[in-house]
């Protein structure tokens, strides 16, 4: 470091002008060298910076291209930076080393300096390079730090992305589960709503059931109350019934309620063993009428009728044929009383009111004519025919009027046999007295024996007459009913024909019972029983035909009841005229002769009856077609019956008329039956006034026998309850035919109960016919009186039982 001191010494030495010029030249050279060195340094720095920048850009691009090689890039970048830093340093040192000789040479050349100058220049350059190197290193460190931060950031970002994907997946799963839960929630909400609705409905039903329960409770209480009231009323009614029964027992009335064929309970009143007073006062009758239609009213009515019948029978016994007018008056009273009973139907009452003017005369005529028939019977048949007309007038009353006439007989029959016995005995006594006076044939039997035997006889001819006599009745019915319609003169002719035919009919009927009596003793009961068996066979033939058309008969009866009443009135007038006309009287001998003649032809008659039974069917059909022309029927039938000695035409016509009457109206039957009744009553004159009513009853029995032909056909057939009821008075009789006839009658009564008035009319007519027939056969063998009497009795009994059915 001696250079400055030497220089100063030199300057001091060179104070001369020359010395000064040299010094200036040296300073200028130094300055020029320093300026070049600065420029070189600046260029070096710029180049290094450019290289570093390019390296940085390249590194960044590499990092962005592959994240997986990020670590490698980082390492590579760090290496590259180190290399870059090394390179410039080497380059700088090399350049510096290279430039230094050139500068030094230039400076030296320019300055002409020495080694001292070179040394000073070297020191300044080394200081500048060290400073730049330090700056470069700092920059590299900053770059490395920046790269590290970037790598950490990228790793965090990647982790965030992974976690985000996981969260998204979890979110999706949560959303699905949430939707499922929402669906389940809606389902549960719906179920809750439905359950709430069901709960409301159940609550409503519960409320309704409670309300119904309350209503049922109230109803139950009301029913309980009504039940208690009804129990109380029932007890009261029971007590009243007991009192009524006590009163009935006190008065001797016994009520037997039985079920009729139609299902209704018919109160048949049997006043057994009780004998009522002989007379009924008006007060008692009014009381009985006021009782009403109840069973008690009917019972009292029946009792009154029974008493009336008993009174009539007793009076007839007391007042014989000599007091006929008196008996007629009593019968009229009975008829009037029976016409308006409380128990009768309103139709019967109306009809009785309509026919009231005829009742008295007709009833009187019946009994009067019956008495006359008893007296005149021994005398003549022509007289019988005339009386037949009178009896026809009697039979002419309306169906309704005839109904009350017969009930008296029926009720007397119901009295248990006591009244019937009285009445029958009365009739028997009358017949005996009259027969003693007229026929000189005394009764061989006591009243009891006559009663039973006559039952046999009576019922036998009833059955026989049921077929033949009843057919005759119906024939007369058809003739008279049809003919009065056309011409009154013709009706008179018909009446004459009836008289003639009635005489023949009585002969025929006499023949039948005579035939039965011929094998046995005429006065014995055996003959009677034989009669019963014989006629029963005849009846069976005739009955089936009648059985065929009961329904038609009922309908026609109702339809023609009105017309029949008018026809009957006309017939009555004509018959009354005929009745007035005197008739020659035949002696009893003539009658017997006629009967014997008929007996000879009995076999023919029976055969003809069988033929007639077949003819009836055809005749029934013909009559159904030609009901308006009964005359033609009668003519055709008469032609068929020509074989019969006396009454062939009448028989066939009668049988055909039976069927015709079934088809036609009961009213016509009543008219014709009434005529035949009168005719037969004349023939049976010995039966007496009582016989007329009983004959009517027998006619009822005949009608019943027709309808119930099956029961009559087998006389030994078991009896129905109705038959037992009817045969109560007849069980005393030994023969079963009687009971069978009663059975048939009772059954017919029940069947005909719908038209009681019509059945009664038929019964009246048929009874009169039967009584005439019975009286005729009785005359011949000498049993005339007992047979006629007991026929009347049986007829009365049967008629009464029938009327019981009709009343029910």
From Swiss-Prot:
User: Compositional bias (Low complexity) spans?
Assistant: 110-126
Q: Which residues form a coiled coil?
A: 128-250
* InterPro entries cross-referenced by the UniProt entry: LRRFIP1/2
Where is the cross-link described as Glycyl lysine isopeptide (Lys-Gly) (interchain with G-Cter in SUMO1)?
A: 305
Q: Where is the composition biased (Basic and acidic residues)?
A: 41-58, 82-97, 471-499, 506-515, 603-619, 646-658, 718-734, 780-808
Q: Where is the composition biased (Basic residues)?
A: 567-581
On assembly, the entry states: Homodimer. May also form higher oligomers. Interacts with FLII. Interacts with MYD88. Competes with FLII for MyD88-binding, even in the absence of LPS.
- What name does the UniProt record give this protein? Leucine-rich repeat flightless-interacting protein 1
- According to its UniProt entry, this protein's organism is Homo sapiens (Human)
């Amino acid at each position: 470091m001696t250079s400055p001191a030497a220089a100063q010494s030199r300057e001091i030495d060179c104070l001369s002008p020359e010395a000064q010029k040299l010094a200036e030249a040296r300073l200028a050279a130094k300055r020029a060298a320093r300026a070049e060195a600065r420029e070189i340094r600046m260029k070096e720095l710029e180049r290094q910076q450019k290289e570093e920048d390019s390296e940085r850009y390249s590194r960044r691009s590499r990092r962005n291209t592959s994240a997986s090689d990020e670590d490698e890039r980082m390492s590579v970048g760090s290496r590259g930076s180190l290399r870059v830093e090394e390179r410039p340093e080497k380059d700088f040192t090399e350049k510096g080393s290279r430039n230094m000789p050139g500068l030094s040479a230039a400076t030296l050349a320019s300055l002409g300096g020495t080694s001292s100058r070179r040394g000073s220049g070297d020191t300044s350059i080394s200081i500048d390079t060290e400073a730049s190197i330090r700056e470069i290193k700092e920059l590299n460190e900053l770059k490395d730090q920046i790269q590290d931060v970037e790598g950490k950031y990228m790793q965090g970002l990647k982790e965030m992305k992974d976690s985000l994907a996981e969260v998204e997946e979890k979110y999706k799963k949560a959303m699905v589960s949430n939707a499922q839960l929402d669906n389940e929630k809606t389902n549960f909400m719906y179920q809750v709503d439905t359950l709430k609705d069901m709960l409301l409905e159940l609550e409503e039903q519960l409320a309704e059931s409670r309300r119904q329960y309350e209503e049922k409770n109230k109803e139950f209480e009301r029913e309980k109350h009504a039940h208690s009231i009804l129990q109380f009323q029932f007890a009261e009614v029971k007590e009243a019934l007991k009192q009524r029964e006590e009163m009935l027992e006190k008065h001797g009335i016994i009520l037997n309620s039985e079920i009729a064929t139609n299902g209704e309970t018919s109160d048949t009143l049997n006043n057994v063993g009780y004998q009522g007073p002989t007379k009924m006062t008006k007060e008692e009758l009014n009381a009985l009428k006021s009782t009403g239609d109840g069973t008690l009213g009917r019972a009292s009515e029946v009792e009154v009728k029974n008493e009336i019948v008993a009174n009539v029978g007793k009076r007839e016994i007391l007042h014989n044929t000599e007091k006929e007018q008196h008996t007629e008056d009593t019968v009229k009273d009975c008829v009037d009383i029976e016409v308006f009973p409380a128990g009768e139907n309103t139709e019967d009452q109306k009809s009785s009111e309509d026919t009231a003017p005829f009742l008295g005369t007709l009833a009187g005529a019946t009994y009067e004519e019956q008495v006359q028939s008893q007296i005149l019977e021994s005398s003549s048949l022509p007289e019988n025919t005339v009386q037949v007309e009178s009896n026809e007038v009697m039979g002419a009353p309306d169906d309704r009027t005839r109904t009350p006439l017969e009930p008296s007989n029926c009720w007397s029959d119901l009295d248990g046999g006591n009244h019937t016995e009285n009445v029958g005995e009365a009739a028997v006594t009358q017949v005996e007295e009259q027969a003693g006076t007229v026929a000189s044939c005394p009764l061989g039997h006591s009243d009891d024996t006559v009663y039973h035997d006559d039952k046999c006889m009576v019922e036998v001819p009833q059955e026989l007459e049921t077929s033949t006599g009843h057919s005759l009745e119906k024939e007369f019915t058809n003739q008279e009913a049809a003919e009065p319609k056309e011409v009154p003169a013709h009706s008179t002719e018909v009446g004459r024909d009836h008289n003639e035919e009635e005489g023949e009919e009585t002969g025929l009927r006499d023949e039948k019972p005579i035939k039965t009596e011929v094998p046995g003793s005429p006065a014995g009961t055996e003959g009677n029983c034989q009669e019963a068996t014989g006629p029963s066979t005849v009846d069976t033939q005739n009955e089936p035909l009648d059985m065929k058309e009961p329904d038609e008969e009922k309908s026609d009866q109702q339809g023609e009841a009105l017309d029949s009443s008018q026809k009957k009135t006309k017939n009555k007038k004509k018959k009354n005229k005929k009745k007035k006309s005197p008739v020659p009287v035949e002696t009893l001998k003539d009658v017997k002769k006629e009967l014997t003649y008929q007996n000879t032809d009995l076999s023919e008659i029976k055969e003809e009856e069988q033929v007639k039974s077949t003819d009836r069917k055809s005749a029934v059909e013909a009559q159904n077609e030609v009901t308006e022309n009964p005359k033609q029927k009668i003519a055709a039938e008469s032609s068929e019956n020509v074989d019969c000695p006396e009454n062939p035409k009448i028989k066939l016509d009668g049988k055909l008329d039976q069927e015709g009457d079934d088809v036609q109206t009961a009213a016509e039957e009543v008219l014709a039956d009434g005529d035949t009744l009168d005719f037969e009553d004349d023939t049976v004159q010995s039966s007496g006034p009582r016989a007329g009513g009983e004959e009517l009853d027998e006619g009822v029995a005949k009608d019943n026998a027709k309808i119930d032909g099956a029961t009559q056909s087998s006389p030994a057939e078991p009896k129905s309850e109705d038959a037992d009821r009817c045969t109560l008075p007849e069980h005393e009789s030994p023969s079963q035919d009687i009971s069978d006839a009663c059975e048939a009658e009772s059954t017919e009564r029940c069947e005909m109960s719908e038209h009681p008035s019509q059945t009664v009319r038929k019964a009246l007519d048929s009874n009169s016919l039967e009584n005439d027939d019975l009286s005729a056969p009785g005359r011949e063998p000498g049993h005339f009186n007992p047979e006629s009497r007991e026929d009347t009795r049986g007829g009365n009994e049967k008629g009464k039982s029938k009327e019981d059915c009709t009343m029910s």
